[in-house]
């Protein structure tokens, strides 16, 4: 049984899925665009989009925004922002459950693969636990870094770099909680730490390679979507509609459909990395052709 996997094969595994299961990938992309549309509609309807637009304008000004200015804009919008992010997290859990069932067990259950089952519930709880653990770790590391900085400025700079590296290492070690939650029936955080043991650089390389592709292609597609929306009479601007009336245009519909579907494929690619690594590490797939 192979105990390792190829980072490059894992990074490009979504293309293999697209070749074998094009209908599933298309459904996932369309549902992702739908989730983006719902998220943007909630942001626009609750006033959160307008607040973020005003904050973006403030942040781009020549002078550094004061804490009072930031609070005056974002403070009243915090309930709306929290509600919008909560809706997005819940809907994303459904999409993730759909993708993990398919990539790990080749199963599609429910409407278009969507199901409100234990996988979705565990993933949502695990996501909250992941955010909590990362937040605590960031606070502890930040506190230690600040103490070191008070001793010597040069040591403080090195400590900042070390803390960034530590957070990347820790976050990546826990990043497979979705995959491990499905295969073990648990939250998957501890199991993720075990799964990534000795494979950090392989996971890092796979995610970094796919991230570079996402940045390049995402920039191109977003530009095309923005130009297309502008041709239809809609100026996208910051990427968020200020209100529901502004969102209810053909231009925004075109932007969300194109960019949302492509973003869905990008997100599916990140999930495929974990699933592919799991299968290849177990020997379910042919062993890596190379170490790269």
Regions found by a protein language model. Name each.
Residues 1-2, 284-292:
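Short, charged juxtamembrane terminal tails flanking transmembrane helices
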Residues 2-38, 113-136, 169-217, 268-271, ...:
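Interfacial aromatic "cap" segments that immediately flank transmembrane helices
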Residues 16-19, 69-75, 113-117, 149, ...:
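Helix-boundary and loop/linker segments of multi-pass membrane transporters
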Residues 41, 75-107, 149-186, 248-285:
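Selective recognition of hydrophobic, aromatic-rich stretches within alpha-helical transmembrane segments
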Residues 41-60, 139-147, 220-237:
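Membrane-helix interface motif
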Residues 51-73, 236-245:
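Perimembrane loop-to-helix junctions flanking transmembrane segments
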Residues 127-158:
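Short, charge-rich, low-complexity alpha-helical interaction segments
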Residues 149-153, 219-261:
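Extracellular/periplasmic helix-loop-helix junctions in multi-pass membrane proteins
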